[in-house]
């Protein structure tokens, strides 16, 4: 089925006389006739629901739609994009393990991996996304368990060479995990290029209206956990906290990852999305394919205007032919990338501050990928916790402005940018 149709009708097919829109099952619990019936659910021997901290029908319908959009085999929703990335990483990493990650990932995820997970005994090596294959392979250690990157990095807007990173990951017997938030599956399906796990902050383009926090994890169902059983004991040996289930044996490579993340991590951490929020997310998904066209068109128009403005020192947007990532964008993102543009002003950080203050349509806010245009200075906000060396490695200089182009008229956006630049 075409992704446009999946956006509208995926995940839920109503039966005769059933609601056309997905139903909101706003209930914490579910009734069963016998304790034996419920016991089968607790033993993962039957399909169904017993407590919404783990699974809920509304959430599952929306997760199924996202799974279909990505071309995966199983998916789950979380309370935020950060929860999705943490669950996905912690689902296969434990104390003593190691992660290889792109250096240009979102500041919050960088902090999650480099600081919070380090407190759990999980270390990381960060690599330039444009590194050579030799440099990438040199980052691996015997205890490396996963490679992580973003299809389009936030806010440096670097493009991940998915095939290169997948090749290296698989050569070392580990999966490639890709955060596909910015392009969404409308513009890129990482599984088609070798990725194994995909994550999303559904708060961004999928919701698209700045209304609902959420995240998603999708399994491509191709990584053979049992073939590398010694690396992944959590999936390939009995889980003492769940009746001795061995997830990879019971559910195979198509379902083991999401089943473990749901039955074990969601049980223990509870970062679940509410049914009402899942319902609202679905409303956003229904128009995702249409909105992404406008976001991409506006992003390109703004990037082209900025590239030719004398007060702009540089522009990061992979759709521009001048971008060092243009060839990768043509390969992985032929139909467009996203509506986010980042750029630096010739006058430095103070010029960036003045520029943002003078904007009329674009609001200064810590958000991105909204219907309304917004901007911020990452070095003083989303990446504020990084030191100068880390900022440089992440592609986030002090003067950088990140602008998320919304659904307004491109002509109006450019006029607003022009008048603000005139005052710098």
Residue ranges and their predicted role:
Residues 1-56, 64:
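N-terminal "arm"/small-domain region of PLP-dependent enzymes with the aminotransferase-like
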Residues 7-13, 75-308:
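Conserved PLP-enzyme active-site core in the AAT-like
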Residues 34-86, 108-116:
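Conserved N-terminal alpha-helix of the aminotransferase class I/II PLP-enzyme fold
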Residues 269-272, 276-278, 283, 287, ...:
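Conserved small-domain helix->loop->beta segment predominantly found in fold-type I
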Residues 29, 220-223, 345-348:
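Short loop segments at secondary-structure junctions
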Residues 1, 114, 123-124, 138, ...:
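PLP-dependent enzyme catalytic core of the Aspartate aminotransferase-like
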